[in-house]
Design a protein with these regions (language model features):
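Active-site pocket-lining/capping segments in soluble small-molecule metabolic enzymes
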Residues: 2-168, 173-317
């Protein structure tokens, strides 16, 4: 696309009051849930009255299958990078590559598949593509080779101390920083951040991980090893409820959970505007539930279900 590249700052709409007038949601599954977004995004555009007027889709993030630089979750999906990028470009949404492998070494930087992926996504002019990243080694490499990206500091760094978050927010390399979900309700410290730092905070809203988990970093490292095709033993989570897998109802009971009401009544009035929804490793039905809960007015949720999948001949059993 021709023309001047728009940065994420230019896509925001400050209202001049210190409060955020928009909440930007960063959604999972750029590759993994392409088919869902192919149906949902036209609906979001055509029937804007179904959705909260204070929210926008800030980005869709993910990684394709067999992505050596990937992290957080193992990527997937059957669509090409070109198709995934074209879909987000059609609707004016930033595409983010999740390249948050924490165990990369210098020899991994020459991976042909990952470099081609970056060449595809860095070509676009507007909106700008981003990279969610953990490794400083990869960050330096991408800055040198693909200067068109903006960067998001990954939650896989597990920044659980507020001083760590503050230091990360002050790094000029990052346009956004996703803190560990256990800092979500540290309102006294969050309220005291400078406005320019508040603009960079991207809260992880719907984490289901046990709030007291001490192995979160080990879990992410296990995913990084899997993406590197390591033969080391798998990590097995021993946290309470881990054997049940992800349940949105349990996530809502998590002390770090951020509800729609929290966003409207606490975070936006404090000047925060960026909210990440996790879910790349889940099923598309659950992703739809997230879209209904966070973006859709309650009275229109049935309309969205009907437009996407629900008809009078659908059998569940």
């Amino acid at each position: 696309m021709a023309g001047k590249r728009k940065t994420m700052e230019e896509l925001r709409e400050p209202d001049g009051t210190g409060e955020s007038c928009r909440a930007y949601f960063h959604l999972p599954g750029l590759f993994e849930f392409y088919d869902l977004y192919q149906v949902f995004l036209p609906l979001f555009k055509k029937h804007r009255e179904y959705f909260y007027d204070w929210c926008e889709i800030g980005s869709i993030y993910g990684a394709p299958a067999d992505c050596l630089w990937g992290g957080g979750r193992v990527g997937g999906g059957e669509h090409t990078p070109e198709e995934a990028l074209a879909l987000t470009q059609e609707y004016g949404i930033s595409a983010r590559l999740t390249l948050s492998n924490s165990l990369l070494r210098k020899e991994h930087l020459t991976d042909a598949r990952c470099n081609q992926l970056c060449r595809v996504f860095t070509k676009v002019q507007s909106p700008q593509s981003g990279v969610i990243i953990h490794s400083d080694l990869l960050l330096k490499y991408l800055q040198e080779q693909y200067p068109g990206f903006y960067y998001v500091s990954s939650t896989t760094k597990v920044l659980t101390q507020f001083s760590q978050l503050e230091n990360e927010l002050r790094r000029d390399e990052f346009q956004f920083v996703v803190p560990d979900f256990r800092l979500n309700k540290n309102f006294d410290r969050l309220r005291g951040l400078q406005p320019r730092l508040k603009d960079k905070v991207e809260f992880l809203c719907n984490e289901c991980c046990w709030f007291g988990c001490a192995d979160r970093k080990k879990c992410y490292e296990a995913v990084s090893r899997r993406n590197l095709s390591s033969t080391e033993p798998e990590f097995h989570c021993k946290s309470p409820g881990a054997d049940e897998g992800y349940r949105f109802s349990r996530a809502m009971e998590n002390p770090g959970f951020i509800s729609v009401e929290d966003i409207q009544n606490r975070y936006m009035p404090m000047g925060f505007s960026n909210f990440k929804i996790e879910g790349r490793g889940l099923g598309s039905a659950l992703i739809l539930e997230f879209l209904l809960y966070y973006l859709t007015k309650p009275e229109y949720q049935i309309h969205v279900r009907e437009d996407i999948y629900l008809d009078n001949m659908l059998d569940l059993f």
